[in-house]
């Protein structure tokens, strides 16, 4: 089928490139029904959220099941500077090129940004320049309420944990059981549906509460949660460093049930990772129920279903499972869905959005999705976690590179967010670029190992010179890239990524290998960790005493067959953010090991990970305001 001829908008680009919000505000978005119609979606396939957003219903998949999938493209990058190298911008620019200039059916699949960093240091995540998702204020704030649903679900579970411990501390086994299974007016007791899951887990094959022995009553009614083992924390979608460590239960009515806990940012919740990795409503119900919140004092894992909550959480999340349809500046469709952390989770948008998109574009169409952080983290997790659960295979993997980042990897001065760039980054230095290309080469070699064709997108800045750009192209081709293309989509929109679009099309059409995972699932947790560490260039792995204990615990509990999601710095292949280039021969330290059992992965912590960001001295919110005459948002970046 042809391209998005009905909805394509040609941009009038200005030089120098105006602020992102000014570009976004200058373009009148199309009604989302027009974008939907171009994907052959009829009104029964989606729910409108205002004029520019719609939730695409999962039921669409039933109708398009027989359609052949389009091409699947993942966008990763080299090890970034703190300024970012433009993965989101490249993802959007490429899709604008494919849809608006190369007449292809295309859908962009992106993560939903967290509101916290939008007001903090990072700003928004809608792309930039003339490659953006619009309306950008709606994209960056609230969207269709998915993160609010995650916050509500997460905190309901947190409340249930503390309350259950409180009630168990003040009641006998018999009193607990009587309240959990109260008799009806006829004096008859029954188990509600979710209780049958707990009975099955305990190996109690009885359907009548009155048939339970006193021992079975105790086992069923008393979860006996070990407070020191609780891993579930409360969340909110605000950067608030003062909530990182708090104590709860200080009130006079809580009978001294005080414990230390803390808040994470909402997108760090396991429920967000569940949303991203789920394949259907039924699958989401199972994953939410399997989430482990801690252990009993006997060392047994306690789940959301044990607390009686799996069904209620699914009800709170039932609309959040539907991806949100939006558009780019040039009128090509975007599915925004899920935004898990890229360190303690896998940092990719949802499986269901990708599956819907691949059917909607059909054979010869393109679905382009972005993987958070550099390819060592984002693309690795995309392949070994996301593709393992989805069963999908990408034909092409893009590695976004900038001259700026390569100069840093070649030994250039430190790049610090919020500080002016050193002169080395603004003047020609081919030697510095060439030295830094060891980083690019390792990303290409690692990504190629999965079986996809690798295309390097060189995101060009105005200070880059021809000699520097040519050095990057040569290094990319020498390392085994399928192609390496210079792009100017930030300054020119889709027009600036046409060559990239052509290269990606050729790469997809010429893929010859199946997807190869880095490790099988049936080896030990340690063997999987070591396989990933080897891809970083590590000579070995060192485990803390805590990590050893946790690996033993998760293996004993039956979770050793899960994939591994490494939580490490994005600023180096190694655990040390200051080590640039392509370090090797180092020992990777594993400080702790945790599990997102419902989402379906074990995550080792390499170093310290903050799951609740703070605000800088001058947060982005200083610049954000509303034009009260037009109702337009100003200053959002």
From Swiss-Prot:
EC number: 6.3.4.3
InterPro entries: Formate_THF_ligase, Formate_THF_ligase_CS, P-loop_NTPase
Keyword Nucleotide-binding: yes
Catalytic reaction equation(s): (6S)-5,6,7,8-tetrahydrofolate + formate + ATP = (6R)-10-formyltetrahydrofolate + ADP + phosphate
CDD domains on file: FTHFS
GO molecular function, one term: ATP binding
Pfam (any one): FTHFS
Highest taxon above the source species: Eukaryota
GO biological-process terms attached to the record: tetrahydrofolate interconversion
Record flagged with keyword Ligase: yes
UniProt pathway: One-carbon metabolism; tetrahydrofolate interconversion
Keywords: ATP-binding, Ligase, Nucleotide-binding, One-carbon metabolism
Binding site residues for ATP: 81-88
Recorded family membership: Belongs to the formate--tetrahydrofolate ligase family.
UniProt subunit comment: Homodimer.
HAMAP family reported in the protein's UniProt record: FTHFS (MF_01543)
Annotated protein name in UniProt: Formate--tetrahydrofolate ligase
